[in-house]
Amino acid sequence: MKTVTRWTIRIVIALIVLTVALGFWAHHFLEQSLAVLDGSTHLSGLSSSVTVERDNLGVPTIRGKSRLDIARALGFIHAQDRFFQMDLTRRRSAGELSELFGKRAVAVDKAARRNEFRVLAKNVLLRASKEERDVVEAYTEGVNAGLASLKSKPFEYSLLRLTPAPWKAEDCVLVAASMLITLQDDQNRYEQSLVTLHDTYGRKSLPFFASLITPDDAALDGSTAPGAPIPGPDVINIRDAKPVALNSLIDDGSLMPGSNSMAISGAHTTTGAAMVANDMHLEISVPGRWYRACFIWDNNRVTGVTLAGTPLIIAGSNGHVAWGFTNSCVDTADMVPIARSEQDNEYHGPGTSGILKMSRHESVILVKGSDPVKMTTDWTIWGPIIGKDSDNRPLALHWTGHMAEAFNFSLLGMEKATTADEAIEVAHQAGIPIQNILIADSAGKIAWTVAGKVPKRVGFDGRLTVPWVYGDRHWDGLLSSKETPVWSPTGVDYLWTANQRILGGEALQLLGDAGYARPARAAQIRDDLKNLVTTKPKGIVPKDLLSVQLDDRALALIKWKELLLNQIAAMDPEKGIDLDQLPEAVKTDDLRADASSTAYRLVREFKLATWNRVFTPIFAPCVEAYPEFQYRHMVSEYTLWTLVQQKPMHLLAANYLSWDDLLHQSVNDILVSLKKVHVSPKEATWGKQNTLASKHPFSALLPSLLTRSLNFPADQMSGGDDMPRIQGQTFGASERFAVSPGHEEEGIFEMPGGQSAHPLSSYYIAGHEAWVKGEPTAFLPGKTEHVLTLTTQ
């Protein structure tokens, strides 16, 4: 027995020693791929030495003699800190993820390959100006030098047992294309959904269920419209329709890629310079989406966020002008029905162009550990065939995303713009995914316009699919700078964007509709800004705009809270529904999306349950006709609230006795959902549901013990939807900043995650906690802690 015990002890000790040894080996192995922070290293191609100074958060200040040297150095540090992320981003749009992850990525690659972004990227570079091309080439050479300077390849490639492919200049365009397909739908499902609604219930259904202008809109020009009446039973009547199953996962469209931006004129700031604040709402990825940087060269200083894989400051300030973006929801795509000829590979061209032949584009997807996958896409003069309409006609996608002239690196010009007017001109030349841009200059002026390329439609508004074969409906190129709407009225005090419809009238006709966000968030920002300029007419500072960004009051739910309490009071407990604690939990606070709030969670669930029970049966025929039907983009708060208030029986599913019956079932849905997670109403805080769940791409590939240090902490988050502080489990503000140009030292910034993508780096999540808590850090880099000198020899 003693012998067995001794051997057991020896085995345990050996296992402990082996585990410790493996841990030390793994740590040492991972350390080899950490970025170089101090000392000096040669970087070929520099005209003179460049210094990279990092502060306590790892934010670099890059000092050089020329913009080309800055680009080369930026490429170097991007590669050292973020190369694997850059690689995933270029491969996402190129359709090359299967080379890393095997069969599991083939479906994603097929969808991307149809766009042929790598071919387009090469054409974009051929069209680029010499200045832009030189910057991209310098950046690319810097990336490859930075990758080569690591002692070991980035750790992700060691785990995948692969060698990283060198960076190419065209990959910078592919990174932009990946952002494009994040912000825009390369299947144009919004237009196809509108057409499906039209085909299912007729044109009379559109004003109510897909209204372009509503009474609650928060446009910059104040444009609104009376609410459309509910369609009568002659248009739509579901009372006798067969009951349908409810969706298990409710997506009401409240957490979609978007953003907030706001600007205050210099008349209301302490400095006299205008001020801009920006928080771009995206998936909270690991590592974070952005890479902070400050560039200093030849009397220029530009500070802001870069996108690893590109050489640009995307949003920030240059001392004269500050700018920020939000997704514009401008219509940049149209579906074109294809009229086939007698030959299967031929179709009728527009007007008098006659019979044209389809172009058959073949592609091969390389798959790690498996055979290559071949795919074929038919292209027309308008774009690729991506589906069929209700008459079984092929549909081609005509999209600015397939046009080389819609991509460029002209945003570089923002770095040297000195006035809002100059910045507007740069925005109109920029080839980026079409965005709202708010601009603030040091003289106090603020302005809104769109940055990027907008199609110039002739003969139609682009909302519904129309035939192009007659030649009277087409695109006449892209809008010129003179044709592109600008909003900067004399004496304007503040501006705001939150993915809402920005303008009405002729401007709306030019920009079109790709699914604007519900207006509640924009209206709340507008009203917050109005309150600021009223209470602090000449005293607004950056922290004031941060307070707007962090506004988590659920104003859009106030009426729903009252409705919920009324329904609870009217329900009969004897019917087996346990209402104990529910009223008290709903009344606990003033309805903020605070992590500790029970009221916000419960009222929100009530509204979502009602959304589900009302709209699922109404749109069931649309989903049957078009499985990817997206009513989340269409129906407004006005639509749902009007139905709940007016209670039309012809729009009530047959499995409900009355609208009150439906609302009572929605109340019961709350209780059912709480029972599933074993939480009582008084314990059902919002934070328990809204817990950050952002995971590293390798989380699904490694044991959970190893991935804990890779993923972001599972913090209970404040913030929700339909309010300025947008926050979900994996979605929210990808950064927040507020700054006045010329006064950057007073600016503030916060961002999820850190600068480095390496889990052993002290900068892996540096600054993350400040973002979670809404605590500002400085906009400019702080005191230097590390200095790396990049030398010419």
Model region roles, listed by residue range:
Residues M1-L18:
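N-terminal Sec-pathway targeting helices
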Residues R10, G23-M280, V286, N299, ...:
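Substrate-recognition/specificity elements adjacent to catalytic centers across diverse enzyme folds
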Residues S48, L126-E156, A267, G272, ...:
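Structured, non-membrane catalytic/scaffold regions adjacent to prosthetic-group chemistry
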Residues N115-V119, T140-E141, G401-A404, N408-Q435, ...:
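Proteins synthesized as precursors that undergo proteolytic processing into mature forms
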Residues M256, W297-L312, G316-V321, F325-V469:
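Glycine- and hydrophobic-rich flexible loops that cap the catalytic core of alpha/beta enzyme folds
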Residues A430-L532, K607-W611:
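Hydrophobic alpha-helical segments
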Residues L511-K575, L663-Q793:
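Terminal end segments
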Residues R604-G687:
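Charged, long alpha-helical assembly modules
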